[in-house]
C-alpha cells in the first residue's frame, strides 16, 4: 500500500470537490491530509489567485455551481471569495488535520456557504469536533503559521 499525501487549501472549491472523493484513494494507501496556505504559495511565486482576477472568479463560480449538481455534491458559494483562511487552517491543525476536522471546515464553507472567519461558526465547528476551548484551538495553529510561508514544507 502506498502513502498518499494530499495537499489542499480550503479556499478552493476544486479542493472541496476532490475531498468528496478522497475516501476512494484509501483503498490504495494511507492518505495524509496536508493543508497549505495558498496565499503563501501565491506570494512565493508572485502571482494573483484565481479569485483575485474577476473573470477567473466568475468562471470558477459558474463552473463550480454547474459541476456540483452534475456530480451529486451539495454546494453553496460562501458570501465572499476569496476569504480569510487562518481560522479553518488553525482549527484543522489543532485537530491534528484529521479527516473529521477537514470535512467540518470544507462542509461549513462550501456546503453550508459559511464565512470561515465568523467567530460563532468557528465556535460551532470546534464544538462539533469536541474542542472545548476555541481560543486554544486558534493559538494551537501558531505552529502552522510559522511554517506556512515555506513552500514545499
Tell what function each PLM region has.
Residues 3-4, 11, 15-32, 97-100, ...:
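C-terminal cap of thioredoxin/glutaredoxin-like
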Residues 10, 14-112:
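Structural alpha/beta surface segment adjacent to cysteine/selenocysteine redox centers
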Residues 2-5, 62:
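Generic hydrophobic-segment detector
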Amino acid at each position: 500500500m502506498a502513502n498518499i499525501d494530499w495537499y489542499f487549501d480550503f479556499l478552493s472549491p476544486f479542493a472541496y470537490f476532490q475531498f468528496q472523493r478522497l475516501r476512494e484513494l484509501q483503498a490504495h494507501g494511507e492518505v495524509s491530509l496536508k493543508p497549505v496556505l495558498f496565499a503563501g504559495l501565491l506570494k512565493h511565486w508572485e502571482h494573483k489567485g484565481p479569485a483575485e482576477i474577476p473573470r477567473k472568479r466568475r468562471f470558477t463560480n459558474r463552473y463550480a455551481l454547474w459541476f456540483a449538481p452534475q456530480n451529486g455534491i451539495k454546494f453553496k458559494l460562501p458570501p465572499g471569495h476569496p476569504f480569510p483562511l487562518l481560522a479553518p487552517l488553525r482549527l484543522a491543525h489543532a485537530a491534528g488535520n484529521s479527516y473529521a476536522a477537514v470535512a467540518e471546515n470544507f462542509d461549513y464553507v462550501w456546503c453550508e456557504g459559511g464565512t470561515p472567519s465568523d467567530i460563532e461558526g468557528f465556535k460551532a465547528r470546534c464544538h462539533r469536533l469536541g474542542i472545548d476551548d476555541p481560543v486554544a484551538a486558534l493559538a494551537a495553529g501558531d505552529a502552522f503559521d510559522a511554517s506556512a510561508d515555506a513552500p514545499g514544507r
